[in-house]
Regions:
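Hydrophobic alpha-helical transmembrane segments of multi-pass membrane transport/permease proteins
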Residues: 32-68, 91-101, 208-219
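Transmembrane alpha-helical segments in integral membrane proteins
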Residues: 88-112, 187-203, 287-308
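Aromatic-rich transmembrane-lumenal/periplasmic boundary elements in polytopic membrane proteins
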Residues: 207-255
């Protein structure tokens, strides 16, 4: 009995520690990308906190002194604050693209191209477990980082949304204030992994992963529930103008210049926006669509890996 127990103990220990060892291997192989991601999250969070504190204080003083109209004409502190407010959104979007590139190239295709993955499969690590670790480890850091950024961004919007000139603008900023911000880079990860498994060459996988995510990004920006067009009168910040005949034209930039307004026959202005009541239905549906696409990409990746492994 004692001999049997001694024989069973190492096997049990191997089963317990092998997943941890695989996680450590993924972290070690891609520690450079991990440090870049942590630096991005820390830097973007710091910038958001600056906007939440000192930046907002300066903008509020300028707004109290000059008002919206004066700040726009003078390009004052509140106008600059309104522009800076959107920078983190741009950074988050670029990060999703970068994640797709990383997943397609260094994470998957490079290891398949060099034979590192095949070597791991011969050393008691099944292809399925290898792919699970490749997906789970980056996904965990992506979820933690984007949840933090989304929480701080929402706090910033709740506290100082009044400092944005003419209110909230780009659709992408609305997107960055909710759970879809977490789902988008996960989709980038899944698409990159799928492309990497299909191509198995680093440079082509990089290019195709970026192109695949670009297609998703372009579609997301122009189809319901991802995009809606609503008209609302605005002051000083206008995206479209209407003539007395009802024709819609590009804003000529007249502001309050009556001669300019008369020259272009402009009688009113509108801009595109998403009303608050429409936010959560769209946000949750968008998140669901992105997560569904992520699940499909992951399922296809595992199916492709099984077929490749069976074919040898």
């Amino acid at each position: 009995m004692s001999t049997a127990t001694l024989r069973e103990t190492p096997a049990a220990a191997t089963v317990t520690t092998a997943p941890r060892g695989l996680v450590r291997t993924v972290l070690r192989l891609h520690r450079g990308a991990l440090w870049i991601w942590l630096a991005f999250v820390a830097g973007t969070t710091g910038f958001l906190l600056w906007l939440l504190g000192p930046g907002a204080h300066t903008a509020q003083r300028a707004l109290a002194t000059y008002g919206y109209s004066g700040l726009i004409r003078a390009n004052g502190s509140a106008d600059e604050y309104s522009s800076l407010f959107y920078y983190p959104d741009t950074l988050i979007t670029l990060a999703s693209f970068a994640i797709a590139l990383f997943a397609g190239g260094p994470l998957i295709a490079r290891e398949l191209e060099s034979g590192t993955a095949q070597l791991a499969w011969t050393q008691s690590v099944s292809p399925a477990r290898w792919l699970t670790a490749k997906l789970a480890v980056p996904a965990a850091f992506i979820v933690l980082g984007t949840c933090l950024l989304t929480a701080v961004y929402r706090q910033l919007w709740s506290a100082h949304g009044n400092l944005l000139i003419a209110g909230i603008g780009p659709r992408s900023l609305y997107f960055s204030l909710g759970p879809a911000t977490v789902a988008a880079p996960l989709l980038g990860l899944a698409l990159g992994v799928l492309v990497g498994l299909a191509v198995r060459r680093t440079l082509p996988a990089l290019a195709l992963s970026g192109f695949a995510y670009f297609l998703v990004y372009a579609f997301r920006g122009n189809h319901w529930p991802f995009q809606g067009r609503y008209q609302q009168p605005e002051l000083y910040s206008r995206s479209r103008a209407f003539t007395s005949a009802g024709a819609e034209i590009r804003d000529p930039g007249c502001y309050d210049d009556k001669a300019c307004l008369a020259k272009h026959d402009v009688v009113r202005f509108t801009r595109e926006y998403l009303p608050s009541s429409d936010y959560w239905p769209r946000q949750l549906l968008e998140t669901g669509v992105l997560l569904a696409l992520t699940a499909v990409a992951v399922a296809l990746a595992f199916a492709l890996l099984r077929r490749r492994a069976a074919a040898g």
